[in-house]
Curated annotation (Swiss-Prot):
Record's catalysed reaction(s): ATP + H2O + 4 H(+)(in) = ADP + phosphate + 5 H(+)(out)
Cellular component, GO, one term: proton-transporting ATP synthase complex
Main enzyme class: translocase
E.C. number(s) listed in UniProt: 7.1.2.2
Protein name: ATP synthase subunit beta, chloroplastic
Lineage: Eukaryota, Viridiplantae, Streptophyta, Embryophyta, Tracheophyta
Amino acid sequence: MRKNPLVLGVSASVETNVGRIAQIIGPVLDVSFPPGNMPNIYNSLIVKGQGTAGQEIQVTCEVQQLLGNHKVRAVAMSATDGLTRGMRVIDTGAPLSVPVGGATLGRIFNVLGEPVDNLGPVDAGITSPIHRPAPAFTELDTKLSIFETGIKVVDLLAPYRRGGKIGLFGGAGVGKTVLIMELINNIAKAHGGVSVFGGVGERTREGNDLYMEMKESGVIDEQKISESKVALVYGQMNEPPGARMRVGLTALTMAEYFRDVNEQDVLLFIDNIFRFVQAGSEVSALLGRMPSAVGYQPTLSTEMGSLQERITSTKKGSITSIQAVYVPADDLTDPAPATTFAHSDATTVLSRGLAAKGIYPAVDPLDSTSTMLQPWIVGEEHYETAQGVKQTLQRYKELQDIIAIPGLDELSEEDRLIVARARKIERFLSQPFFVAEVFTGSPGKYVGLMETIRGFQMILSGELDGLIEQSFYLVGNIDEATAKAINSSMES
């Protein structure tokens, strides 16, 4: 932690070590330095000069390789348009540092920690380097407690751990960003602490939507910006790979300060962690490394581990991280999602099949898992209900082939009852979201854990066998489903 260095983490002793650009290949620069003055790996370099059109240029880069012959190879954090060979490059003598603390709340930053929301400069007295070691084993906290989300399928079948890492896995267009926005809506509002959102390589429109949503809900207070509850850090799809690779670390550094110095419980949302891997793959290729499986960087596990191991709970405070993970071609065995799986305490897997049926959130109840779903953590009642739901859905899945060809009539009475209950459960796992009210036309619903357990117990026990399955679709608690069934029977 450093007090009052210049913006962008440039050390106060500027221009003590100056090099020259020797080669430019897209976002990668080779820089020559005087003998004996080589910058360290991860040092921040600043290119200053005038472009061909006379415009002022200032590009920040990060040292990635020491090449020999007094040259280093660095990756640019912004566009390299207008750079030419021979331009002066200043070694700042330290890694990239970003503003941290209360001054970051309510503001939007880029990877360099510069505000990009047109609300003026950030008055941050303290900056922190984005590269730092993970907390030591002796500092870690191992308390186990559930993080209630108000989303039925999550709370019942794959509950989240307070201070844990949660992965939202899904292919393109199955609802990852909507789910993460609903979690922000449900948790960040109810959660008294602060949140940090890292937009890593996703759509700029979604970043803008989220900002507007937070202003409307009061999570960001424009009138009293210091009373806001969230800091936003964006490195979107149009940014160079260097920015997309490091923006997750910028967001994490801000979250770590709230945990370690302010001793708060922090929520860290990352959308999308796959883009972090993808940017690392692009940078790896540009640096000339031999690709590994499916074209990914050979350092995939190391890069992922260095980010994920910093996201943890210590004796001072906790970081609960919720990360959207894009699954290429819906293949969960792809190295990027497979590597992320290893770090997750809970995995929420989104299914294209359920999305096609119109069941939202399209969370696969059989593929989604959680280390918290143990009777000694969640209690016997919760555990037994969750297992009953999974067994019913698993049996329904096994019977699909028989239903598809000979039909329901070929099933035994017991199996027909299981199918009917499974279809009710499947529909009852859907839920109207607050952030999707404009699409569904239904007001959003927050369902408490005890209400969720009671509803599924009633379906499993057979109390609601007489109700039509459609009455369970897109409702909150079980009382709404029974009221909907009574209304539809009266209308018919």
